[in-house]
From Swiss-Prot:
Its cofactor is Mg(2+); Mn(2+). DNA ligase that catalyzes the formation of phosphodiester linkages between 5'-phosphoryl and 3'-hydroxyl groups in double-stranded DNA using NAD as a coenzyme and as the energy source for the reaction. It is essential for DNA replication and repair of damaged DNA. PANTHER family: CHROMOSOME TRANSMISSION FIDELITY FACTOR 18, DNA LIGASE. CDD domains: BRCT_DNA_ligase_like, LIGANc. GO terms for cellular component: cytosol. This is DNA ligase. It is an enzyme of class 6 (ligase). It comes from Ruegeria pomeroyi (strain ATCC 700808 / DSM 15171 / DSS-3). Belongs to the NAD-dependent DNA ligase family. LigA subfamily. Residues 49-59 have a biased composition (Basic and acidic residues). Keywords: DNA damage, DNA repair, DNA replication, Ligase, Magnesium, Manganese, Metal-binding, NAD, Zinc. NAD(+) binds at residues 34-38, 83-84, 117, 140, 175, 291, 315.
Amino acid sequence: MTEAEAAQELARLAGLLAQANLAYHTLDAPEISDADYDALKQRNAEIEARFPHLKRPDSPSEQVGARPGEGFSKVSHAVRMMSLGNAFDDADVADFDRSIRKYLGLDVETALAYTAEPKIDGLSLSLRYEQGVLVQAATRGDGEVGENVTANARTIADIPARIEGAPEVLEVRGEVYMSHADFAALNTRQEAEGGKLFANPRNAAAGSLRQLDAAITRARPLRFFAYSWGELSEPLAETQMQAIERLAGLGFQTNPLTRRCADLDAMIAHYRDIEAQRATLGYDIDGVVYKLDDLGLQARLGFRSTTPRWAIAHKFPAELAWTRLEAIDIQVGRTGALSPVARLTPVTVGGVVVSNATLHNEDYIAGRDSRGQEIRDGKDIRVGDWVQVYRAGDVIPKIADVDLNKRPEGANPFEFPEQCPECGSPAIREEGDAVRRCTGGVICPAQAVEKLKHFVSRAAFDIEGLGAKQVEQFHADGWIREPADIFELRSRYGEGLQQLKNREGWGEKSATNLFQAIDDKRRIPLARLIFALGIRHVGEVGAKDLSLHYRDWDAMAAALDTARLAALAHRAADTAEEQERQQAQAEGRRARISDTRAAVIAAQEVPPEAAAAWADLIGVDGIGATLGLSLSDAFANGDERAAFDRLSAHLTVIPPDAPARDSPVAGKTVVFTGSLEKMTRAEAKARAEALGAKVAGSVSKKTDLLVAGPGAGSKLKTAESLGIETLDEDGWLKLIEGL
């Protein structure tokens, strides 16, 4: 490898690893496997060792985690939260022991004890206690600055709010995780409610901890293992093992498989023991962490730039198996997304029989990622291929590699369908979207079933006795084709009660109860109705924002009708803008974006009332153009609009409570920042809105009041610089007291 090639490869690796860190640590959506990540990092280290003068300022070897997200206030760690070096085999562990002895000047005969503990696959968390009281919880972030998740951490049963007999200042560090059983139960609940399924327990734990609404975190079964510490006002113990035992004595959960190992042989033996138990532990681990037991020697060894010299993670080999890809099936979801699924010759991976694997989208099958870069060295996936399957607690396992040497003669590249396999409608892929979608809408049976499941989910109509299973049965029998049919069941089949009660699994009481439950939902809040429609991009929060803005179903529908021409002009401008950007890039000039948009919109001759209605729609806090276009398309689609109208004829839609107009915050823009100890962020937002305030997510000249809790960061500084009134939580509660 030449210097030029090395520099080019280091730049490529820096970009790949930065994206991987962002996806894993900040977005909670890993894009590559742990094994692939470790391989990239190892290659980067090897090239840097050969060409040290080419080491980049943004070298992955100097990075820990990724920058914190934008949804929480930031916390600076008093003691940096470090990463760990990796060992991939016994020889690496022996090298680790040898390097410690060399650094300390100890020969091979000198006894060195280590602790060995499972490496939990979760999210790192630092808990700060002062005078025995939990005052702050923060994620690792980039090691120096993390996210303040104190309110969420307080909801985790394994995390004590108070501890007795601890140092005045104690930062306890550990891992938030989710057990396999709890993960399966959560996904079952998510599916029944029409919610998003989590890919694996680690993603579920990370996503649950990083909720802006602590009430959501409280409803998720999170656990916590303590294994380390940060800032201390006095030492915990003299050895690592004693310190772990003291943490357990203070009331923290510590891993029962943590052992003190007298020598290298004992470390490897315990690694083998943990590896053998891995499939039966009930939670995910991806290796064993060794730490020098003597804390005095740990202090002498100190740290490298991102890792301690006295600890290392001995990683498990990836759980992999080879099998044959028998078929590729296409499933159609609620929003029309065509999702390919691999049907495999059953194979055991990590103690579990696997017969299906996700293939994500057509790019993944073709050997490309979402940015068009090669994955699997550009190897595509074909029916008949021998594929390498891996799993790490995933709902559906994934394909890691393809053996081209075993590819059957005549195996053809997979042709992703351009028509929906369920209804035959065109399946199109919009610019910038990784997914191809069916355009059939309500005429597509697959979309209809998934939309109906969403409609009856807990966050939508929540009809007792009518869940996903019943929806599938009723749809298959032709009883329910669209939401309006649910409210016609009694009239259509109810002298038909006899028909329903005679079905398998039904009786007179359950049938009567179902009809009553349906009748109970004929009065529905506007926000729930909007969410229940299953319009793409419209979640619970967006539905609530729309309901607060329009306050009436007919008023919202009329506003969308008025705004339609402006919405179409906006889409045409988006298309022209992208074409101009591509053409400018090809011609090596600067794109004239604003001129292009203005010209296209002017050419559409949008009526003023349409422009005003569109501006009003996308100006709703939290809505924007993407959601606005999706909403406009749904109401402009003849079949969908007719279905909406048939449904609304059966309902009495309840407007949201009118916000108070005589409160001290009515008409004001309020921002909350930092930790709130007496209410969740969602409760604070709901209360402020009920009192007539508008709650914003950022501070600007339009902000009237900032409510700042502990850990308030840049928002507080901005408010002070702008002269904006600031209150602490108690001041806010006093302001609204009695209202």
